[in-house]
């Protein structure tokens, strides 16, 4: 499964040689959102896909900030831009840049004596993580981080905006959303469900 991903063919080859069922990319994105995009494209072939993540903690982006010199800890929130979401829901099929779809907000605990201006600049200019987004950086205490940012919520939604009719006169929106109190717990629940399915499929030959 998942042969479209770079590692897919190798996983598939190993599974076939071992006479097992392989699974990859079975979280929620890639994973559940991927399945939603697949069936939405089949139902509305004349349309566009849109994906928004958040509001929630991005563990990868938080870790990227922690690697900056002078940073003790961080929580980074990915936030959908409401104006962009509403534009998609309206059926206008907008062309949206990365910056227009999401903002990023960082709550950073700095080491004592660290150069805060340097840290903020490094965050905002970090390629592949923050440079393409409008990013806000807040410096807070370790106590504030533990009190106000001690959970790992996340979520997001996938929309397919499409048209039908002889003159494309009818507009449709398919929207699938997740609102998660605990991203790790929800993701592990998906993986366990897929593991059960893989085991059953393997047992059935």
Identify the function of each model-found stretch:
Residues 1-22:
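Rossmann-fold NAD(P)-binding glycine/threonine-rich loop
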Residues 2-5, 25-34, 55-59, 112-113, ...:
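Gly/Ser/Thr-rich loops at beta-strand to alpha-helix junctions
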Residues 12, 32-48, 63-73, 197:
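Oxidoreductase and adenylate-handling cofactor-binding alpha/beta cores
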Residues 19-41, 191:
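Short alpha-helices
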Residues 22-26, 52, 75-76:
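General beta-strand structural signal in soluble alpha/beta enzymes
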Residues 42-43, 47-54, 105-110:
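Short beta-strand and adjoining strand-loop segment in the mid-core
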Residues 58-195:
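C-terminal substrate-binding/catalytic lobe of Rossmann-fold NAD(P)-dependent oxidoreductases
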Residues 197-205:
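C-terminal helix-rich "cap/oligomerization" subdomain common to oxidoreductases
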């Amino acid at each position: 499964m998942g042969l479209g991903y770079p590692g897919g063919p190798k996983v598939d080859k190993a599974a076939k040689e071992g006479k097992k069922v392989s699974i990859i990319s079975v979280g929620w994105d890639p994973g559940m959102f991927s399945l939603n995009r697949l069936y939405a494209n089949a139902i509305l072939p004349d349309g566009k896909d849109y994906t928004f993540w958040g509001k929630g903690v991005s563990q990868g982006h938080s870790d990227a900030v922690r690697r900056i010199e002078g940073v003790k800890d961080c929580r980074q929130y990915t936030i959908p831009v409401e104006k962009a979401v509403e534009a998609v829901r309206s059926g206008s099929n907008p062309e949206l840049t990365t910056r227009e779809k999401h903002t990023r907000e960082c709550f950073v605990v700095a080491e004592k004596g660290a150069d805060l201006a340097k840290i903020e600049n490094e965050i905002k200019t970090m390629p592949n993580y923050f440079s393409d987004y409008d990013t806000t950086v807040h410096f807070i205490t370790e106590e504030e981080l533990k009190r106000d940012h001690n959970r790992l919520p996340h979520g997001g939604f996938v929309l397919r905006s499409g048209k039908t009719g002889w003159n494309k006169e009818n507009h449709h929106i398919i929207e699938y959303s997740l609102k998660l109190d605990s991203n790790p717990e929800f993701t592990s629940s998906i993986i366990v469900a897929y593991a059960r399915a893989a085991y059953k499929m393997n047992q059935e030959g």
